Amino acid sequence: MNKKSLSTLEFYKITDQLVSYACCDGAKKILRNLKPMTDITDINLRLNETNDALSRIFQKGTVDFSQTKDIRASVARLKVGSSLNISELLNISAILSCAKHVKDYYEHREDSISGMLENLATVDALNSQIKKCIISEDEISDDASSNLRSIRRSKSIANDRIHSELNKLLNSPTYRTYLQDYVITTRQGRYCLPVKAEYKSAFPGMIHDQSSTGSTLFIEPAAVVKLNNDIRELELKEAAEIEVILADLSAKAGEHTEELLCDYEILVELDCIFAKAQLARHMHASRPVMNTSGIINIKKGRHPLIESHTVVPIDIYLGTDFKLLIITGPNTGGKTVSLKTVGLLTLMAQSGLFIPALDHSDIAVFKNIYADIGDEQSIEQSLSTFSSHMTNTVKILKEADENCLVLFDEIGAGTDPTEGAALAIAILNDLKMRGVTTMATTHYSEIKLYALSTEGVENASCEFDVESLRPTYRLLIGIPGKSNAFAISKKLGLPDYILSDASERLNAEDVHFEDIVSDLEHARISLEKEQAEVESYKAEIASLKEKLQAKNERLDERTDNIIRKANEQAAAILKDAKDFADETIKAMNKHGMTVAELEKHRTAVREKMNKNQAKLKVEPAKVKAHKAHDISEFKTGMHVKVLTMNVSGTVSAIHPAKKQVTVQVGALSTKIDIKNLEILSDYKEPKEAPSKAAGGSGKIKMSKSAGISTEINLLGCTVDEAVARLDKYLDDAYIARIPQVRIVHGKGTGALRNGVTAYLRGVPYIKSFRLGEIGEGDAGVTIVDFK
């Protein structure tokens, strides 16, 4: 990749940012030398790594690689059998600890970096041994070996003895007058006392040092010379034992040189990958879609070196209908920034970095990128001359091909406008004919006309607000830039007569061209305003639609709650009424009743039902849409569903005039409008024989037994249908004093049998029930015995 272009497009400023996110020195060095790649497979692999690292950061946060020390020199020494010092062994422990932390922190998942994580070798035994033996760079643990512990214990005892002897001298009345100070000190590793110089002959011992004034001598008392010698001997033994411990640890580390080296390389690579992910997160960048077709389609691209609160995103595309894009517009209007944005984002993408643009932005892979940009807008370089521009251009024309991207800033500038425009058109046309993807900025109208009249070339402009005299930095592809010199001059107060004189001096063709461009600009602005209004209306409609939908959902929820509560209340009332009716039937069967007594009980039941009905204070629930039935469709014995109560029953009477039918629900009988009924099946209950009173006895005799079967067949019914039919059948059978009945429900999935069993448990007048035995129908029937 062209190094000059990397510098011109400020790629190294991106790598400087990238380096700041790396933790270890090895990763920083690699990232500082990062260069764009030209193989799309390698690029996509690096982008996959960045993407997967970013995903892991979002899920579990980042991890610290700062303990990844460069152990390559230490490993090389281990390979030849050398012993490592304390610092080197601590670095190896740090590498192993970091490997374990990274491996444990990021759980297993299949992605582009999972293989690296799996290949990390933690070598726990070695790491534990190093940590056990070494406390810090200055201290070896007593637990490193039993011999070291013994030596240090002896050394401690010797220290205590020597301090005891010295303290005796300090407290001795004889020697106190000889001492300059009452402290114990060390000189040359030996314990001494500070003695006044004039008493040196009176204080037996060895002189090791004196004060700067010479008034104090540091004398090792004769009484502790042997003890000092003992301590010195123990110190030498301690040092020798430490060397043995370090040699032993080094030997153990030497058994894992390949794992240690592999861990270091993997951790450095992971640090690089996670640094790229951190940069992407900081820039709010996204993954580009790479291609080898020369297509660039950047959506809302932002120059990464411009402050996020000031940068204006641009949409820019080329490589499909055209490969040469001419950008025109005022100075400081964003033309050069547009060039640099395309060039820099391409370099970033080819380096495996995410780009500050919207998702699914397309970036082409180029073999080389050439940038001839007059760096008048860079504080680091001075204005280029025409000669230097032309030198760059000659080099570009020699080297560029269809796999390259060429960026020209103010092509043909710095010389006579007529000659400069002609040269620029010739250069651009040559690159177009060779299929080179090219972007160029210019002020020349001739180049705008060339773009308008040449296939495969497109105009673009940087928008300028004449009212505020400020560029908007928006890039508009398909519209050539308009020279705003006259409008700006008038806005700034230049007299009209000068403007008029200048207009007359313009070439007629130039005036016509500028008028066309001006008309296009006005049409574009008008269209954008209309489009903005349409988008505003669409957003308002969407908002209203969302609010209406939310309101309807709340209303539906409220309605459902009302219906649910009403159904619960109705079910409770029905249960209350049925329980009362059951008790009445039980009493009637037990004692027998006169017709008058029966009528009295019937009146009591009706009064209780009326009271229960009064409790229902909710509005009738809205009935869900269903097929409307005509009164002629209803037959006695037909099974129906009462939609307002969500219960099933049997038609016992029909009232055509009122379009109502009487529905029997268990022991409860009530009139219902047919609009609130749904026919469930054409099933008809067997006709019941009319009850007759026994001859003058005044007792009710149940002669229904002649019309009540000892068996009910529920095959083909749903659970709800079966329970409704079973409820009425059992009432009739109990009243008819049939001692035992047989319920046929089949085996099937068991749902119907379970529903029947659950219902039977709540019937008060049932003595017992069981599944059929062999010969009775087995598990396909249930036998019920009444009380």
UniProtKB/Swiss-Prot annotation:
Residues 712-787 form the Smr domain. CDD domains: ABC_MutS2 (cd03280). It is an enzyme of class 3 (hydrolase). Disulfide bonds: none annotated. Its EC number is 3.1.-.-, 3.6.4.-. InterPro entries: DNA_mismatch_repair_MutS_C (IPR000432), DNA_mismatch_repair_MutS_core (IPR007696), DNA_mismatch_repair_MutS_sf (IPR036187), MSSS (IPR046893), MutS (IPR045076), MutS2 (IPR005747), P-loop_NTPase (IPR027417), Smr_dom (IPR002625). The keyword RNA-binding applies. ATP binds at G329, P330, N331, T332, G333, G334, K335, T336. PROSITE patterns: SMR (PS50828). Keywords: ATP-binding, DNA-binding, Endonuclease, Hydrolase, Nuclease, Nucleotide-binding, RNA-binding, rRNA-binding. GO terms for molecular function: ATP binding; ATP hydrolysis activity; ATP-dependent DNA damage sensor activity; endonuclease activity; mismatched DNA binding; ribosomal large subunit binding; rRNA binding. One of its GO terms (biological process) is negative regulation of DNA recombination. Pfam families: MSSS, MutS_V, Smr. PANTHER family: OS10G0509000 PROTEIN, OS10G0509000 PROTEIN-RELATED. Endonuclease that is involved in the suppression of homologous recombination and thus may have a key role in the control of bacterial genetic diversity. Belongs to the DNA mismatch repair MutS family. MutS2 subfamily. NCBIfam families: mutS2 (TIGR01069). Homodimer. Binds to stalled ribosomes, contacting rRNA. This is Endonuclease MutS2. It comes from Lachnospira eligens (strain ATCC 27750 / DSM 3376 / VPI C15-48 / C15-B4) (Eubacterium eligens).
